[in-house]
């Protein structure tokens, strides 16, 4: 899920948004990044299952070629105005994931706060590399081969698009000169 700057409606339609005024999600001591996303959208999962995340679960953020692993320390439901759990804390590297609840009513917020695990486990680094590898575009090969076979068929069968008639031929036909 891509993370964009800001939390406008347009931003949250594309992916998760970084809450302005909080630390950027780049890690480091005394940082607390807040990432928000929608849930319950028909066209995207985003944070739909955030209510199922529990203490001890882990997630990763890939930023600037580095993989950061976070382990969930607490989950809570708060009113939208309650921001006391989003403050930085001495020497802690925190990320809080936020979405609306109850689904469809959206009167409260789910906060899932996690602390960074250092060093990043090798298994998380390997998983991030594997997920970011783009597969070979086999669809392009299939399209090119299919197009080539069809073109070869038409060429070998002698089927040609009739050439355009010249202007004088058209005028001659109109005058009845053609036999």
Language model features: what each stretch is:
Residues 145-160:
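Alpha-helical transmembrane segments
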Residues 1-140, 158-178:
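Solvent-exposed, non-transmembrane regions of membrane-associated and secreted proteins
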């Amino acid at each position: 899920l891509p993370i964009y700057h800001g939390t406008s409606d347009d931003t949250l339609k594309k992916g998760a948004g970084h809450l302005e005024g909080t630390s950027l999600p780049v890690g480091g001591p005394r940082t607390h990044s807040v990432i928000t996303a929608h849930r319950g959208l028909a066209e995207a999962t985003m944070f739909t299952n955030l209510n199922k995340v529990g203490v001890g679960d882990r997630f990763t953020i890939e930023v600037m070629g580095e993989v950061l692993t976070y382990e969930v320390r607490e989950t809570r439901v708060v009113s939208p105005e309650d921001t006391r759990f989003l403050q930085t804390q001495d020497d802690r590297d925190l990320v809080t994931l936020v979405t609306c609840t109850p689904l469809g009513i959206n009167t409260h917020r789910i906060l899932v706060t996690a602390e960074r695990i250092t060093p990043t486990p090798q298994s998380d680094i390997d998983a991030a590399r594997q997920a970011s590898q783009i597969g070979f575009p086999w669809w392009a090969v299939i399209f090119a081969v299919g197009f080539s076979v069809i073109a070869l068929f038409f060429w070998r069968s002698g089927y040609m698009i009739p050439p355009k008639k010249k202007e004088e031929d058209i005028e001659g036909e109109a005058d009845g000169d053609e036999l």
